[in-house]
């Protein structure tokens, strides 16, 4: 293990929640995970992120399925990521330049945001098992490895998404550890990319 790998592993262990003692964790089936994800309507949570360079960021997650997600980072970070209608935009709120844009289908987050999740019928699933008391499922597009992969981690009692790890095609890893997911009334304006462009980007730079 090289120094970078050791540092990343240490950061992941610090961020990763431990399964509660006294509760016997069980392996969730792909059917159970699919049912859980399809049951998510609108939730919010705090999060802690371990970035590819081992720096730590915090922020707030808004998730409104299908298709909508917003991750807004706390200061001093200036990042904002939002997706709606199949489009994902990544803003640097201090840059005064337009966001980077990607089709959601070309990102690992598609697994989480698609309308009907059926992991039993997904050729994208490349891993499923237990680690550290959590059930994990790992997915990637075998025809498009350059899109990267995502590993979702779940508790079993109650069933809940606790974290994810995104790995890009170059070996970079980004780990997101979620706080408790809370049901919420979330206005769709929170995912309005064009409105955010108008707010953050001077007209001459759009």
Task: Show where each model-derived region lies.
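Boundary at the C-terminal end of the N-terminal hydrophobic targeting segment
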Residues: 20-24
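Gly/Pro-enriched, hydrophobic low-complexity segments
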Residues: 120-121, 126, 130-206
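An acidic-aromatic
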Residues: 56, 60-111, 174-175, 180
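A short, Trp-centered hydrophobic/proline-enriched beta-strand micro-motif
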Residues: 35-54
């Amino acid at each position: 293990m090289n120094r970078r790998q050791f540092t990343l592993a240490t950061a992941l262990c610090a961020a990763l929640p431990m399964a509660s003692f006294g509760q016997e964790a069980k392996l969730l089936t792909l059917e159970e995970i699919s049912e859980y994800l399809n049951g998510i309507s609108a939730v919010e949570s705090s999060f802690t992120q371990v970035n590819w360079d081992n720096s730590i960021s915090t922020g707030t997650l808004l998730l409104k399925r299908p298709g909508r997600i917003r991750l807004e980072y706390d200061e001093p970070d200036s990042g904002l990521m939002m997706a709606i209608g199949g489009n994902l935009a990544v803003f640097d709120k201090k840059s005064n330049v337009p966001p980077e844009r990607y089709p959601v289908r070309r990102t690992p987050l598609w697994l989480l945001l698609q309308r009907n999740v059926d992991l039993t019928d997904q050729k994208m699933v490349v891993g499923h098992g237990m680690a550290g008391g959590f059930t994990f499922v790992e997915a990637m597009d075998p025809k498009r490895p350059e899109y990267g992969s995502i590993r979702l981690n779940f508790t079993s009692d109650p069933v809940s998404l606790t974290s994810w790890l995104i790995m890009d095609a170059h070996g970079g890893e980004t780990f997101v550890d979620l706080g408790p997911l809370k049901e919420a009334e979330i206005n769709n304006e929170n995912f309005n990319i064009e409105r955010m462009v108008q707010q953050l980007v001077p007209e001459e730079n759009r």
